[in-house]
Amino acid sequence: LAASASAQDKPVPYWASIASGEAMMRTGPAKTYPGVWLYKRRDLPVRVLKRHESWRLIEDPDGARGWMLVALLSERRTAMIKPGDARSIHASPDEGSRVVYRAEPGVVGRIDDCSGSWCHIQIGKREGHVRMADIWGVDDGEVID
């Protein structure tokens, strides 16, 4: 689903994700500006840094910044496993809980129910809890219902 009018009015910065299977990042806030990156990864988390009419200045997980039409963005919260080693996905939001699987760096999942230092994450058909420190796409200590 594309971002709703309420999402367009959110104070910046805020988190979003790529809604479309193909989304062009541009050097400026208009289709006349050159495209710098064509994203082909639905649900990729992005940080919205600035608004200009129907365009948003975004930052991707690699730190690339550019402009994207708001219609190509979604309010759906997603996160990417940070670089480094595979991260443990736990049965419950507790370091001592059973590890249900391990997620490789760069894997993207949908997040919800974040509080304290943990988020519930769904990667494909698998789900569990991941430490916020292990993902990109959520602010430290952020609460997501």
Where in the sequence are the language-model features?
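Second-shell loop/turn segments in exported
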Residues: A30-Y33
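SH3-family beta-barrel domains
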Residues: A7-T27, L38-R42, L49-P93, R98-R126, ...
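N-terminal signal peptide c-region/cleavage motif recognized by signal peptidases
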Residues: A2-S4
